[in-house]
Amino acid sequence: MNPYVLTILLSSLGLGTILTFASSHWLLAWMGLEINTLAIIPIMAQQSHPRAIEATTKYFLTQATAAAMILFASTTNAWLVGEWEIHQLSHPLATTTVMLALALKLGLAPVHFWLPEVLQGLELTTGLILSTWQKLAPFALMIQVAPTINSSLLIAMGLLSTLVGGWGGLNQTQLRKILAYSSIAHLGWMVLILQYAPSLTLLSLFLYIIMTSSAFLTLKTNNSLTINTLATSWTKSPTLAALTALVLLSLGGLPPLSGFMPKWLILQELTKQGLPLSATLAAMTALLSLYFYLRLCYAMTLTIYPNTLTATAPWRLNFTLITLPLSIITILALGLLPLTPAVTTLLTL
C-alpha cells in the first residue's frame, strides 16, 4: 500500500477513536465509530486474496449492523426521554440495544461469531490492530453506559464470553483463530467486573492490549500461522520461541506472569461484591483457556520436529526494526506482576 494512503488511514483510525473518546453526544460518538470502521476496511482488504476480501465484507456487515443499532437506540432514547447525552441513556429498550450493539462491535458472546472468521482472513499486523486499537472506542462507550445497564445482563454476557472463549479455542489449529477466542475470553473478564470496578476493567484492557500485541508481534517475527509452523520455530530461533511460550502462558493467566494480575484482582473483587458463584465459574472457564495455551507451549518446546538443518541455530533476531518494540512490550507482558500492590493501592485512591 502507498505510504501516504496508509498514513491517512492510520490517522483516520486515531481520529475516529479520539472523537468517540471526547464526545458526550451519541451522534458524535457514532460518527467516530464510523470513521474507525471506514478507515480500517482498506487496510484489511489490501491483500488481493479472496479470504481477505471475505473477512473484510463480514467485518463491514457486522460493524454496519452495530452502528445502525446504536443510531436506533440513541434516537429511541431521544424520542422517549428527550436526551441525546451518552450519560443520560435511561430507557430500558435503548440501554439493552446499545449494550448488544457494543457487544457486536467488540465480539462479545453471544454475538461473537464474526470475530474468529474475520481474524483468520487477515495478516497478523492487521489482526493486531483489529484485536487492540479497534476495541478502545466501543469500550469507552460501554464504560460510560455501564451504570444504566442491567447487572445480570453484563454478568451473563461476561461468563458466556469466558466460556465460549475457552471452549472455542480447544480444537483450533490456526493461531489467529486461537487469538480470536482468547480475545473473546479476555473481553468477558472485563465485562464481568465492569459495573463493580471500572478501574479494574481499564487495567485488564491495558494488560490485554500489551499481551496481545506481544503475542501478535512474536508470531509475526516467527512467521507462524499454525501450530505446525509454531512447533518448528525452536530450530529457527530458540530465544524467540521461548519468549513466545512465556507470552502465551501470560495470556493464559499463569503466575508469576503479568496476565495473572487482572484475573486475581477481578476474582477478589467479585468475591467482595457477594458474587462467589460468578467468580468460581469465571475461574473454571479460565482453565479451558489455559489448556489450549499449554497445548501451544507443549507443541513449541516439548515436541521438537526432526530436521535436516546442519546450520547453527540463529540466536540473534534478524529483524532490527521490530526487535526494540518487541523487547519492550514482551518485558511488560511478562514482568508486571510485582507491581500488583502498587496497582491495588492506586485503584483504592
Swiss-Prot record:
It holds the Pfam family NADH_dehy_S2_C. It catalyses: a ubiquinone + NADH + 5 H(+)(in) = a ubiquinol + NAD(+) + 4 H(+)(out). GO terms for cellular component: mitochondrial inner membrane. One of its GO terms (biological process) is mitochondrial electron transport, NADH to ubiquinone. It is a multi-pass membrane protein. Its EC number is 7.1.1.2. The chain crosses the membrane at residues 3-23, 25-45, 66-86, 98-118, 149-171, 178-197, 202-219, 240-260, 274-294, 319-339. GO terms for molecular function: NADH dehydrogenase (ubiquinone) activity. PANTHER family: NADH-UBIQUINONE OXIDOREDUCTASE CHAIN 2. This is NADH-ubiquinone oxidoreductase chain 2. The gene is MT-ND2.
